[in-house]
């Protein structure tokens, strides 16, 4: 019998399986089965999920490992977050490395990581969801055309971004936070990939900001200073290499904002956790430490209130609500939000000592009311809201009611005569 590629795996101690997905401008994937070509018989539920051929390749490597020993490593050569829960669940896979289309030169760095010449220190720039199609941002995606517009013109479609600000980790971590806190109908079945009550562990494989290394680190939030006058937040974090391999570590500074009754009444949406800034150590030998100082711009923690009065005499301004602001560090957004929950007394897998609070005594709509050059901020592009043309058409999601406002798909909408004139 002629040897096959599967047989060749028996001759190698380490098997590297590469899974790839390309993407580009106007080259994204429609989520769920809508993005799958049924004629290819790939047995996919999402184009960013595994095909049978990819499963076969991974399983062949795992089978060879079981027979001959060694390791199985899966490389994700992609720019779009894939559905990889089944790889994570495969006990025969020893490691997954997300490399992100590094190109020919970048693969020298990948080889250095695989060989152990360097320790990885990167962190994920997106949430790896179990099912992409369950996300609120996936409900309005693709070519959603007007029902009555001219099909020969180029601008014959519109996407209603009904998910509001809740994209990526700002959705998953905020809904998780509200589920733990028992608020906003967050545990309802709407948006659940399983059809049962929404549960974070059923929805997320790897969180935003998560990363691993060949060594271990301990981070300590030494102190934190909020300087409202100079509009900065400064954190000093001591990082110690507690493992046996030299490596670098990333310090991520997050903030959790107060979500108030004012916000709910005025349509101000806030993520339960958001990245403020980050820094990175030099290479630390085993046992060595370094203090990383992060100075973040406070405007990154201000929220837009489209109903607020402003210095221009119109509407729209950045605000800071009165209340407690929690600052924390962590290996990704999920660890960070758990630190905040722990500090607030919730029974979660978090470290309360890695979170520090700062209290703003009164509502602030003046600190960020003007730009750096003194121009008053105000609402812009209000006519980009479909409701400005077709009142009452769209409902935008709010964390005050996940169940009642989870996005529906807005397709085959009928454009008004005024809109048709503009489109033509």
What do these predicted regions represent?
Residues 1-424:
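C-terminal non-catalytic regions of proteins with extracellular/luminal or membrane-system context
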């Amino acid at each position: 019998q002629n040897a096959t590629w599967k047989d060749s795996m028996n001759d190698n101690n380490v098997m590297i399986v590469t899974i790839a997905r390309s993407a580009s401008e106007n080259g994204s994937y429609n989520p769920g089965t809508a993005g799958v070509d049924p004629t290819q018989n790939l047995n996919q539920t999402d184009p960013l999920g595994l095909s049978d051929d990819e499963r076969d390749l991974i399983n062949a490597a795992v089978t060879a490992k079981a027979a001959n020993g060694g390791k199985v490593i899966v490389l994700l050569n992609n720019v779009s977050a894939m559905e990889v829960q089944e790889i994570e669940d495969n006990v025969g896979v020893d490691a997954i490395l997300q490399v992100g289309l590094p190109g020919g030169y970048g693969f020298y760095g990948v080889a250095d990581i695989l060989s152990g010449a360097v320790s990885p220190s990167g962190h994920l720039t997106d949430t790896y969801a179990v099912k992409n199609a369950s996300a609120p941002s996936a409900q309005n995606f693709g070519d959603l055309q007007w029902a009555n517009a001219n099909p020969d013109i180029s601008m014959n479609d519109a996407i209603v971004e009904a998910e509001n600000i809740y994209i990526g980790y700002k959705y998953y971590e905020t809904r998780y936070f509200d589920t733990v806190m028992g608020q906003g109908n967050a545990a309802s079945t709407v948006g659940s990939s399983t059809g049962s009550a929404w549960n974070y562990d059923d929805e997320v494989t790897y969180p935003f900001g998560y990363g691993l290394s060949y060594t271990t680190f301990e981070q300590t939030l030494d102190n934190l200073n909020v300087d409202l006058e100079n509009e900065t937040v400064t954190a000093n974090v001591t990082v110690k290499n507690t493992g046996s391999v030299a490596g670098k570590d990333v310090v991520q500074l997050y903030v959790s904002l107060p979500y108030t009754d004012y916000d709910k009444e005025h349509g101000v949406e806030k993520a339960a956790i958001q990245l403020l800034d980050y820094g990175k150590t030099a290479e630390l030998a085993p046992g060595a430490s370094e203090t990383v100082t992060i100075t973040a711009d406070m405007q990154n923690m201000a929220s837009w209130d489209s109903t607020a009065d402003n210095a221009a005499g119109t509407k729209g301004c950045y605000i800071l609500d009165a209340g407690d602001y929690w600052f924390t560090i962590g290996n990704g957004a999920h660890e960070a939000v758990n630190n905040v929950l722990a500090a607030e007394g919730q029974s979660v897998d978090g470290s309360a000592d890695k979170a520090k609070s700062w209290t703003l005594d009164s509502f602030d709509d003046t600190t960020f009311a003007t730009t750096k050059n003194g121009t008053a901020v105000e609402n812009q592009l209000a006519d980009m809201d479909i409701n400005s043309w077709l009142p009452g058409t769209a409902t935008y999601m709010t964390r005050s009611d996940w169940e009642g406002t989870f996005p529906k798909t807005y397709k085959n909408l009928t454009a008004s005569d005024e809109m048709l004139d503009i489109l033509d």
